[in-house]
Each structure stands twice: as structure tokens, then as C-alpha cells.
Swiss-Prot record:
Pfam families: Proteasome
InterPro entries reported for this sequence: ATP-dep_Prtase_HsIV_su, Ntn_hydrolases_N, Proteasome_sua/b, Proteasome_suB-type
Subcellular location: Cytoplasm
GO biological process, one term: proteolysis involved in protein catabolic process
Name of this protein: ATP-dependent protease subunit HslV
Binding site for Na(+): 162, 165, 168
Protein's job: Protease subunit of a proteasome-like degradation complex believed to be a general protein degrading machinery.
EC number: 3.4.25.2
Main location: cytoplasm
Quaternary structure and partners: A double ring-shaped homohexamer of HslV is capped on each side by a ring-shaped HslU homohexamer. The assembly of the HslU/HslV complex is dependent on binding of ATP.
Length: 183
């Protein structure tokens, strides 16, 4: 049976603003099944952002599990991510999921994989999914050669990825944590 797949998730931090954005396309084989899926969420009373790349059905399970870890470790993003990665690697059901998560709060930005990896990206930006390399390249150039806000940077880079990657569209969902606001 073919998997639902194809997405692009990009996270960036600039001037105290943290943004995670994702496109809305869900693909089954060679067919676009949905164009407005939300692959980015707010967790832990809006203080943590999370984006998902992988099979759509797996997203709810992973978001729920990660939220449980955030509650257990009182919002400590790094500790919750490490424990989530351990569970993901060792749990028989979770181990079968092929996915990646980007999670971020005001202090940290991490990628969590089913292999048990927790990666702290360089340069305050990271992208995952089929269009991830395109979004990462565009975001890196924009970060180095523009004064765009984190939100504008994510919007522009995801737009570029949507122009290049057939599994990515321009129907974006974006969540952000501002530098001073009570998001």
C-alpha cells in the first residue's frame, strides 16, 4: 500500500522571533490528495511550536506523544525531545513510523527522528521533508543576505521550495513565537 507523503517544514529564528511553517500538500503516490493540510501546531499551552514531515496518519500520534513528554518535563523542550526520541526508537509501534519532527520554543530548536536522533541545527534554521533541501538553501541565502523577519524568511523560502519541489505547494500554515509577546 502506498504511503501518504511529501511535505516541507521550515523553522527559523531571528531577532527573538521563532517561526515554523509548512506547506499544505498531501500526496499519495503520484496524486495530490489534499492541498491545505496543517502540519504545524502549537503545543504546551502555545509555548512550543512543532512541525511534522512524514506519513499524515502518524502526525497525530507523534504530536500527542511529544505533548505528553512536554507535560511530564514541565515544558523543558530538550529533555522532552530526548525522551521522545528514546520512546520512538524503543516502542514497537512508534519504531515503524518514518517521520521527522521540528520542535522549537524561545530558547531551542530541535529535529527529532525515529532513529533516536535529536539534532540542534546550526544557523538558527532547519528544514525537513521532500522540499527541505530547497527551503533550507533559500532560507540560508535569505538569512545571510537580507534583513527579512523570521516570518518573512520562512514564507519566502517555502514559496521557493513550492516552485521547485513537486511534493510541496504554496498553501502555507505558519506559527510563530514573538520576542516579547505572551503567545
Amino acid at each position: 500500500m502506498e504511503q501518504f507523503r511529501g511535505t516541507t517544514i521550515l523553522a527559523a529564528r531571528r531577532d527573538g522571533q521563532v517561526v515554523i511553517g509548512g506547506d499544505g500538500q498531501v500526496t499519495l503516490g503520484h496524486t495530490v490528495m489534499k492541498g491545505n493540510a496543517r502540519k504545524v501546531r502549537r503545543l504546551h499551552n502555545g509555548r512550543v511550536l512543532a512541525g511534522f514531515a512524514g506519513g499524515t496518519a502518524d502526525a497525530f500520534t507523534l504530536f500527542e506523544r511529544f505533548e505528553g513528554q512536554l507535560e511530564k518535563y514541565r515544558g523543558n523542550l530538550t529533555r522532552a525531545a530526548v525522551e521522545m526520541a528514546k520512546d520512538w526508537r524503543s516502542d514497537r509501534v512508534l519504531r515503524r513510523l518514518e517521520a521527522l519532527l521540528i520542535v522549537a520554543d524561545r530558547e531551542a530548536m530541535l529535529v527529532i527522528s525515529g532513529n533516536g536522533d535529536v539534532i540542534d541545527p546550526e544557523d538558527d534554521l532547519v528544514a525537513i521533508g521532500s522540499g527541505g533541501p530547497y527551503a533550507q538553501a533559500a532560507a540560508t541565502a535569505l538569512m545571510r543576505h537580507s534583513q527579512l523577519s523570521a516570518r518573512e524568511l520562512v514564507e519566502q523560502a517555502l514559496g521557493i521550495a513550492g516552485d521547485i519541489c513537486i511534493y510541496t505547494n504554496r498553501n502555507l500554515s505558519i506559527e510563530e513565537l514573538g520576542p516579547d509577546s505572551e503567545d
